[in-house]
Design a protein with these regions (language model features):
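Surface-exposed polar/charged interaction patches
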Residues: 25, 96, 187-191
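Short, intrinsically disordered low-complexity segments
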Residues: 29-126
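Long, compositionally biased intrinsically disordered terminal regions
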Residues: 104, 110, 118-252
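Short loop/turn segments at secondary-structure transitions that flank enzyme active sites
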Residues: 14-16, 79, 130-131
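Alpha-helix boundary/interfacial micro-motifs
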Residues: 23, 28-29, 85-86, 136-137
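Short, extreme N-terminal segment that most often corresponds to the first beta-strand
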Residues: 1-33, 249-252
């Protein structure tokens, strides 16, 4: 699975229903929202994206759109281990409406989602196989129940040379993550789409470069990235064998 999200949605009601009815977002309205949600930051418009891709924009980029009744923000900064610690000003902006946070990263099988109603946290879950359950606040939502009941166990293929071991969680976080994204926002990243899913690729988001004026500059960030790449081991490639196991191979 290659799904990654860092998503906030503010809404006056049911998010999927509202997103099904949106048209082109107003740029001035969206820019005003950005200034409210990113106080003290330098904000510069750049190339946008669609909702399907904009839920995980490049670092330092925010993809966003504001319509009457619903606002969408895609930003890696909201991918936090404990959703209950979302910055207070972001939660305060949800007064009188619903706020949904959805974040997942396929590399580490991590999922986090949360729901606030009128500024009050009603549900938060964050978990990964390496860290276990990081946060679990409130009662499980209906789409979660089959997972906690053991009806959706993780189906994991072991790496070559490793014995199959029980998965560290009773279900796969990314599978729950897709169901959470559909239930809370109306669309998915991976998997089989359903007829009434929101067409995320048809919803356009504006792009913004967001920078802390007191943070590292572009040259320093590029140097840091270059050092990280140099320290990374070369990639290894695997393919499925006829018996369903993984076999290492040379290159793609």
């Amino acid at each position: 699975m290659g799904a990654k999200t860092g998503l906030l949605v503010y809404a006056d009601g049911d998010v999927p229903g509202l997103l099904r009815r949106v048209g082109a977002a107003d740029l001035d309205r969206t820019a005003t929202m950005m200034r409210q949600l990113y106080p003290g930051r330098e904000i510069e418009q750049r190339e946008g994206s669609n909702l399907g891709d904009g839920v995980y924009p490049p670092e330092g980029t925010v993809c966003a759109a504001s319509w009457p009744g619903v606002e969408v923000i895609g930003d890696q900064e909201v991918m936090i281990d404990a959703p209950s610690r979302l910055p207070e000003h972001l939660v305060a902006a949800s007064t009188g409406r619903r706020l949904v946070l959805h974040a997942m990263h396929s590399v580490v099988d991590w999922l986090a989602f949360a729901v606030w109603e009128d500024g009050r946290l009603v549900r938060s879950l964050s978990l990964s196989p390496d860290s276990g359950i990081i946060e679990n606040i409130g009662e499980p939502l209906p789409f979660e129940l089959p997972y906690w009941a053991g009806d959706r166990p993780a189906d994991i293929i072991p790496w070559p040379g490793e014995e199959e071991e029980p998965y560290a969680l009773p279900f796969h976080p990314l599978e729950l993550g897709e169901d959470a994204l559909r239930a809370l926002c109306g669309f998915i990243q991976e998997g089989r789409p359903e007829p009434d899913d929101v067409d995320a690729d048809a919803i356009e988001l504006y792009g913004f470069h967001v920078r802390d004026p007191y943070g590292p500059g572009p040259a320093e960030q590029e140097a840091k990235l270059r050092r990280a790449v140099e320290d990374t081991d070369p990639p290894r490639f695997y393919a499925l064998s006829p018996d369903g196991s993984l076999v290492e191979r040379d290159g793609l």
